[in-house]
């Protein structure tokens, strides 16, 4: 096959070695004019404007701006069928070995396919789901295209079968025939929708949505294809919150009544309370990148008076995903000992820290159902939460949590000020938050919902 590679940035550099060796690259293209005329393995880098002079079967896009480049190619006269995303092109031809976990046994088998294994909400929900299914007597495997080594080691040692299958979101059914050995496949998170649609005609498949709007822009390259396949799929779709449902339906034109709200549940752990002599500890927990808006937190802390800053603690906890964004935050908190970045923590390490946390703060631009808030409620901790989150419907302001206007630094500072001025309400609001957990997010309630839905799937799909 003759192909043109469009895009020579990080995605190309990280994946060029995976391109099929039998394919002939006839040209490289990029929108960076400084690259024109250079050669890669004897093949020239040229302007996209020159595409008409080449004979090719496919244009393989190796860029995070895939949708924009597709539109550019369409305007240049390239047909839709000749445009393909690079990772999809690489992995849809890969033959996947059968996971080691699939062994002959009487128990029913469930595969949870997710986008990434690590110490973050989507993966932790998979762990909680897997444990609930194991307790119900199912054999469970979790598979993802990438994974954090420490996370995989920790939960493998706890008896959960974890598999890393590179390129899994783009796999073709003929290359994963072993998937028929599973009774149900749960595609966890929207980035797994291509796999879900690929297999849904042959195996009971559900899609469980958690996403905020930004994820849909990242998947916009496939929007038209997804919309068409959804019209005739047997796929059963769930969402963890009304916001997650509405984001999906607004993106692909799906009817809301066809999506079932299915909240997750987490196991119960009650923390102790350390004696801190009146010190209040506020914490933001989550991956460090712009969507989570940790800088909103640090900016709001700056609005408090010096005594309130120095007499209390303000923690940032999470893995750095955006180095430039993190540098701004770390620079800002230099020589400010009251604001600390504690780094990424395992679930065990985070549990130990919770004894010393009084109030969890959520600053995100949007969150469908942030697991950090559910975990805080489970632990009897109150939260400050922006109003543009799926969890806000469960919060009664100043009863079990505090709601503030999204992106409003002044309102966030006022929320922290409220707890500093009214320290006596923290424990009572935490107790009320625990009641929300018990009513909606306990593992017992989750397993009840799970049994009901699995029974429905087995009877109707």
Regions inferred by a protein language model and the residue ranges of each:
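A conserved mid-protein helix/loop that constitutes part of the nucleotide-sugar donor-binding site
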Residues: 120-128, 289-303, 410
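Short, structured helix-loop element that forms part of the nucleotide-activated donor/catalytic region
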Residues: 149-156, 244-247, 313-338, 349
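Short alpha-helical donor nucleotide-sugar binding micro-motif in glycosyltransferases
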Residues: 344-345, 352-357
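Aromatic "clamp/platform" in nucleotide-sugar-dependent glycosyltransferases that forms part
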Residues: 365
